[in-house]
Amino acid sequence: GSEMCIRDRYLRDGEHIKAAEAAAASKVPAAEKKDAADANAPLDFEKIAASIPAIEVVDMGVTYKQRDPESPKFVTIGERIHCISPVIREAMNTMNPEPILKRAAEQIKAGATYLDVNIGPAESNGPELMTWAVKLLQENFNNVPLALDTANKRAIEAGIKVYNRTNGKPIVNSADAGSRISYIDLAAANDAICIALCSADGIAKDNEERMMHCHHMLERGLSLGMEATDLWFDPLFLVVKGMQDKQMDVLNAIKLFSDEGLKSTGGLSNNSNGAPKNVRPIMDSALVAMAMMQGLTSAIVNPNDLRLMETIKSCDIFKNNELYSDSYLDA
């Protein structure tokens, strides 16, 4: 079907990428090669599992409803388990489950489809921390699906090792077309979804550049056996204050992805950074409606923004992704 056409079209261009990478690899200094070899030594998953605290299942008064991973409904990725929050950072540093479970419960109750787990760079204990976080959240919330969000590839690998796929594949957050392109390889090797930022070094200057990055990453994923629909392309939502003239470009990029049968996502609330607190939900919900009209299939959002979630649920009705009933907002 269309998937095969996409695959054939991009595999033809794969060879020049391999040549460029081989050339780049030959220039890496010996000390860096040794670090890379240490970083590539196989993880001892049993040792990691033995080193983390036992997971206690706590009744948080909310369960994650079973979902069909094939559903056409818009996918919200809850953004609130993030080490930039002092409360969450402290909880991660001490492996204290309570603040993390509380944030998870609030987002699940509000209707989040996935939860993002951002542990930061986690250089010293990334694999242990991500293993603990994945087990903690999935064992407490009926295998809630997760996006594993860190620059530490070994942490993502360790998290996927203990991940339960009942409600959806794990998401690798994220690759780009520059220094983070190998996150696509990680997703491919682990049958995961990968968020693919359509940028290399800095923000793409126009949609021609965005699509060049998109096709480069698509080519790579397909050559490694991924399904095109497991790459979720992120056009990069830009701040209105300072980049107002670029907003339609971002929306048009989403349409370009959609026209090629590709899925898309992104940090939607970026657009309203720096705007007054009372204005942000209004901007975010207007933008999500416009973006869904262009074919946006997912976004990384604060699910506890009620206006935004009601807008998304309503757009799912208009797009015929969900059957209307008078109680659709309570679903």
Describe each model-derived feature in a short phrase.
Residues 1-6:
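Short, small-residue-biased leader/transition segments that mark boundaries at the very start
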Residues 116-121, 144-152, 169-178, 198, ...:
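Catalytic beta/alpha-barrel core
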Residues 110-144, 237-244:
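Glycine-rich, proline-tolerant flexible connector loops at the mouths of alpha/beta enzymes
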Residues 177-240:
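Conserved anion-binding
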Residues 74-102, 173-176, 203-207, 272-281:
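Active-site mouth loops of central-metabolism enzymes
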Residues 107, 159, 233, 291:
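Conserved, mostly hydrophobic/aromatic
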Residues 10-13, 168, 180-183, 244-320:
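Active-site-adjacent loop and "lid" segments of alpha/beta metabolic enzymes
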Residues 20, 126-148, 154-157, 161-163, ...:
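Alpha-helix-loop-beta-strand connector modules within alpha/beta enzyme cores
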